[in-house]
Curated annotation (Swiss-Prot):
It comes from Equine herpesvirus 2 (strain 86/87) (EHV-2). It is found in: Host nucleus. Pfam families: Herpes_UL52. Associates with the helicase and the primase-associated factor to form the helicase-primase factor. The gene is 56. GO terms for cellular component: host cell nucleus. GO terms for molecular function: ATP binding; DNA-directed RNA polymerase activity; helicase activity; hydrolase activity; zinc ion binding. The lineage of its organism: Viruses, Duplodnaviria, Heunggongvirae, Peploviricota, Herviviricetes. Belongs to the herpesviridae DNA primase family. Its EC number is 2.7.7.-. GO terms for biological process: bidirectional double-stranded viral DNA replication; DNA replication. This is DNA primase. Disulfide bonds: none annotated. Keywords: ATP-binding, DNA replication, Helicase, Host nucleus, Hydrolase, Metal-binding, Nucleotide-binding, Transferase, Zinc, Zinc-finger. The record marks 529, 531 as: Essential for primase activity.
């Protein structure tokens, strides 16, 4: 309707100018009565004593001249969207002197005068869209008095509907308060904003025009608090000194909006430069966008940009050179470019702490080597070992501790690991280990699942490699099999798989074995547990091989930070978890290589660079995190099969490098509850740099190459190159690996947040003169309890009637019931309604006299994110005044 009316208005004005080229001015009108009724009275020529005021107009020269003028009265459109902001409703001829008084002196024009000089043809075109809807007709009427009679009679018969339509189409008010509150309460802002908004071409909101008016002219003029009537508003507008500057302001608005569009496009381009190219998680992406826009548009930079684009300086700004993007810190851009790019990440953001030491030893070679075939009895598994359950471990270590109190071994798994790490016969180790083995060897500790029980085994002589040689069937009958391609060779390697547990613990150790990580011993082989969630099952052999090659490249790149790496010769062993066994009636033809439906599981093992060892679990955790970041950058390989990878921590498990954690050995099985064997870790050949794969496969079935704390043949061979017996080479011991820029987006985001006082408890006690628990009891808890009653179900509110408070840290107060330890979950209804939920209050202060208290809970249920803290509500409290 607005578009049709606007077109009619333009044609009407052209017709009037052809007939009588009078100067025409548009004015926003208002009446002290009901504008819709008065407008209807004008159109129906009904007697009325009403008058019309000019609230704003587009005559900026303060001079109309002699003769007559054509005045077009307008009303604000209720929903203009992108169309005209005010629409014409009346057009009439007016004496120049009366028009001068109407526009510039605030004198109203009587309705009778308007009726006498009304332009009937123009008015009919103004309201043709509304009348065609009311009469359900689109007939073209004639002009002149006949047309006016037709218009008059139509509106007369449909007066009620016409008045309602006018009220829906136009913003009609009976006082100037809407105008003042919308366009500004000072003279300068009101005149500039209202004139530009209603009568000039622009594409912006009133808020934008208000901001630009303050940039255009800092002086405000008089306050409009005394303007109470349309007469006052009309007088103020017509006599304002800023009316003549509206064209200048309109030109500035055009320049400023064009500059803002240029700057906005430049900022978006700068942000999207990294946004679309880097593998960012959703959290990192949010932080990155926040930081980018904050650097461009923070208060200080925005004020600087506003100063450089004010009316005095905007013409001097280079037209095609953005200003705001220059505010982005070059260091921030450089860090983004290098941190999320594989080629520069390791070089610029990873730091390694190391020193050179003599006598760095892991497992004793005798403990992981096979005994004589006769001693082994031709079988597999452990040849010399001690095994027992938890109670046996406790009894053994208790006896040793009674005989050797200086050993200070704890009677649990940790003590067993400490005992296994002892190997110096000249010290206390010999005497401590006498009850186990004749030689005090540094030996591994394994976990074995047997008869639905967990056994811990300390092994000092092992025949596991012989068992693997019998279980793994190589394509030796094929001539030249050593030179096959990796993928083809993988398909030709078969296993004599077992289905059930074996009859003796010694034999079971050959099919079910997990190595415990021992922080008392240095690490020589990097063992990685790789689990990649899959979008859907069905991976081809070539796809899995491509993933392995990509991961191999990342592993070798990370190892290159620790020492020299020959990428062609350095072995990286891959062992893929066997797919679920097919159903008996499932056809084999067309079956993909990998049918794993939940995840792709790999065990990845590689020796550290020559002469390098790692002590402690922290560097290994850091390496796994770094590798996770590297792997997540492989957009082309992994994103299609695992769309959620950017938001995950990564496919590598970082929790296997702590005391008491173990990882399953290659070529072994998982044992299910029915004592069945499943998920065999099968060899997956991936050694593209070598034409001879026989040595690679042989080493992949050698125990010393697959354990955390044993020196592999490759490591020892490289470490001894060029070293004389008189001057043995020292070992480079890595004690720390640090990603110096880890979480730098989060850290920089936190730096931009309001500063919090470091010790909320001290501030509260200092300002209130009470200890923290007393203040919480008397001041904070009543308000917290009020919110609990308001927002938490009644059946869970009663448990908070009698509580006590425990001061646990500088900003945490734990809430406990008077009876019992904890509460029932207040977030969800669990079937097991146990009182295991912790409730606590967190204190936060970033203002001198105010503290924010947040009620939080921790529920152990999986439905509540497994003990993840959850905030329920926050309340600000004044430390002085009524809250005190």
């Amino acid at each position: 309707m607005a578009t049709g009316r606007s077109t009619s208005t333009e044609s009407s004005e052209k017709t009037c100018q052809q007939r009588d080229p009078l100067p025409e001015y548009r004015a926003l009108c208002g009446t002290d009565g009901d504008a819709a009724e008065i407008l209807t009275d004008v159109l129906t020529n009904t007697d009325s004593d009403g008058v019309v005021f000019c609230l704003a107009h587009n005559c900026y020269s303060y001079n109309i001249g002699g003769g007559e003028a054509l005045l077009t009265l307008c009303l604000p459109a209720k929903r203009p969207w992108g169309a005209e902001k005010c629409l014409p409703v009346i057009q009439f001829r007016c004496d120049a002197s009366r028009a001068q008084e109407f526009l510039f002196q605030g004198r109203p024009i009587p309705v009778r005068y308007i009726q006498t000089n009304l332009n009937h043809r123009a008015v009919k075109k103004f309201f043709k869209p509304i009348l065609s809807v009311l009469t359900c007709s689109d007939k073209k009427g004639g002009g002149g008095e006949g047309a006016h009679a037709d218009l008059k009679s139509t509106i007369f018969w449909f007066r009620a509907k016409f008045v309602a339509a006018v009220r829906k189409t136009f913003k009609i008010t009976a006082s100037p308060f809407w105008m003042i509150s919308t366009f500004g309460c000072t003279e300068a802002q009101f005149v500039l904003v209202s004139s530009c908004y209603f009568f000039e071409r622009h594409e912006c909101t009133i808020d934008t025009l208000s901001h630009l008016s303050r940039l255009f002219d800092g002086s405000r003029g008089r306050q409009l608090t005394t303007v109470n009537t349309f007469s006052d508003l009309a007088g103020m507008f017509g006599t304002s000194a800023w009316l003549g500057r509206v064209p200048e302001f309109s030109a500035y608005v055009g320049k400023k909006l064009a500059r803002d569009d240029l700057e906005s496009a430049a900022v978006d381009e700068a942000v999207n430069a990294f946004r679309g190219q880097l593998m960012l998680s959703n959290a990192d992406l949010i932080h990155y966008i926040y930081l980018s826009f904050f650097q461009c548009l923070n208060k200080e930079k925005f004020l600087e940009y506003s100063l450089r684009t004010n009316p005095h300086n905007i013409d001097g700004v280079p037209p095609e050179e953005p200003i705001i993007t220059g505010f982005i810190d070059e260091g921030f851009k450089s860090k983004m470019a290098t941190y999320y790019t594989k080629s520069s990440y390791l070089k610029n953001h990873v730091r390694v702490g190391s020193l050179y030491l003599d006598g760095v030893e892991g497992y004793s070679p005798e403990a992981i080597e096979a005994g004589p075939p006769a001693a082994a009895g031709g079988g597999g598994g452990a040849d010399r070992y001690w095994a027992g359950q938890s109670r046996d471990v406790q009894g053994l270590l208790s006896d040793i501790l009674a005989d050797h109190p200086a050993s200070r071994l704890s009677p649990d798994l940790h003590g067993l690991l400490d005992l296994a790490a002892l190997g110096d016969s000249s010290g206390v180790a010999g005497g401590v280990k006498d009850s186990l083995f004749p030689e005090p060897l540094r030996c591994p500790v394994y976990r074995c699942q047997y008869l639905n029980k967990t056994f811990f085994a300390v092994v000092t002589r092992d025949n596991l490699a012989r068992a693997w040689e019998r279980a793994v069937q190589l394509p030796t009958q094929v001539t030249g099999w050593e030179g096959m391609e990796d993928a083809r060779l993988t398909a030709c390697v078969h296993y004599a798989e077992l289905a059930f547990s074996l009859g003796h613990l010694r034999e079971q150790l050959s099919v079910s074995r997990h190595e415990y990580f021992n922080p008392r011993l240095p690490v020589f082989n990097l063992v990685l547990d790789f689990d990649l969630p899959l979008k859907k099952p069905g991976l081809s052999l070539e796809r899995v091989y491509s993933i392995c090659r990509s991961v191999r490249s990342d592993v070798l790149s990370v190892l290159g930070v620790l020492g020299e790496v020959d990428e062609a010769a350095h072995p990286v062993y891959f062992f893929k978890s066997a797919c679920p066994r097919p159903e008996w009636d499932e056809p084999y033809a067309g079956r993909p290589f990998c049918t794993c439906d939940a995840k792709l599981g790999l065990r990845i093992i590689t020796p550290l660079p020559r002469g390098v060892a790692i002590v402690g679990g922290a560097p290994l955790v850091a390496l796994a995190k770094i590798l996770n970041r590297m792997i997540k950058m492989n957009r082309e390989d992994l994103l299609e099969i695992c769309p959620g990878l950017p938001d995950a921590d990564g496919p590598l498990d970082t929790g296997i490098y702590h005391r008491g954690r173990c990882v399953r050995l290659p070529h072994t099985y998982k044992v299910n509850e029915a004592c069945g064997l499943e998920r065999l870790l099968r060899l997956f050949v991936c050694h593209p740099g070598s034409p001879d794969k026989a040595a690679y496969i042989r080493d992949a079935m050698t125990l010393r190459n697959l354990l955390h704390h044993s020196k592999s043949a490759y490591w020892e061979g490289n470490a001894r190159e060029g070293v004389s017996e008189e001057a043995p080479q020292k070992t480079k011991v890595v004690y720390s690996v640090t990603d110096v820029s880890e979480n730098f987006l989060v850290c920089q985001t936190q730096q931009q947040l309001p500063r919090s006082y470091e010790r909320p408890d001290s501030r509260i006690e200092t300002m209130t003169g009470r200890d923290l628990v007393t203040w919480v009891t008397e001041v904070a808890w009543p308000k917290v309890f009020h919110n609990i009653k308001a927002y938490i179900p009644d059946d869970k509110t009663t448990q908070f009637h009698f509580v006590k408070f425990i001061h646990t840290s500088h900003n945490i107060i734990q809430v406990k019931p008077q009876r019992g330890n904890n509460f029932v979950c207040i977030s969800s209804n669990h079937r097991n309604k146990t009182q295991s939920v912790r409730i606590f209050i967190v204190l936060y202060t970033n203002k001198k006299d105010e503290v924010t208290i947040t009620l939080m809970s921790q529920c152990f249920a999986h439905k509540c994110n497994s003990n993840k803290p959850r905030a329920h509500f926050s309340i600000p409290l004044q430390l002085r005044g009524r809250d005190f």
